[in-house]
C-alpha cells in the first residue's frame, strides 16, 4: 500500500538540509544516513549517500532512475546464501 497522494513524498529534514548545503557549495562528499525511509528527490542526483543496512553503511550513488524510490531499496538488509544442498550422493 503506497503513501497517500495528498500527503506527498517524505524525506527527513536533516538529510534534505545536508543535500541542499552541498548543492549550494558544489561539493561532492559521502553523506552517512540511517534514514532508509526517505524518498529520493531530484536534488539528490549525483550525490553518494551511505545508507545503513543494520551492520554497515552501504554507499549508494544516486542516478536519475532512482528518483521517487526510497533509500532503503538500494541497501539490502539480508544476505541470501542459498538453500541447503542435496545430500543424496553422500548417503550411499
Curated annotation (Swiss-Prot):
It holds the Pfam family Ribosomal_S19. GO terms for cellular component: cytoplasm; small ribosomal subunit. The keyword Ribosomal protein applies. Coiled coil: none annotated. GO terms for molecular function: rRNA binding; structural constituent of ribosome. Keywords: Ribonucleoprotein, Ribosomal protein, RNA-binding, rRNA-binding. InterPro entries: Ribosomal_uS19 (IPR002222), Ribosomal_uS19_bac-type (IPR005732), Ribosomal_uS19_CS (IPR020934), Ribosomal_uS19_SF (IPR023575). GO terms for biological process: ribosomal small subunit assembly; translation. Protein S19 forms a complex with S13 that binds strongly to the 16S ribosomal RNA. Belongs to the universal ribosomal protein uS19 family. This is Small ribosomal subunit protein uS19. It comes from Geobacillus thermodenitrificans (strain NG80-2). The gene is rpsS.
Amino acid at each position: 500500500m503506497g503513501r497517500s497522494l495528498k500527503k506527498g513524498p517524505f524525506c527527513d529534514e536533516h538529510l534534505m538540509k545536508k543535500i541542499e548545503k552541498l548543492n549550494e557549495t558544489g561539493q561532492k562528499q559521502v553523506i552517512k544516513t540511517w534514514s532508509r525511509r526517505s524518498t529520493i528527490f531530484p536534488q539528490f542526483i549525483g550525490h553518494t549517500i551511505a545508507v545503513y543496512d543494520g551492520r554497515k553503511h552501504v554507499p549508494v550513488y544516486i542516478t536519475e532512475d532512482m528518483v521517487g524510490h526510497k533509500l532503503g531499496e538500494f541497501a539490502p538488509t539480508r544476505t541470501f546464501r542459498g538453500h541447503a544442498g542435496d545430500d543424496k550422493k553422500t548417503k550411499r
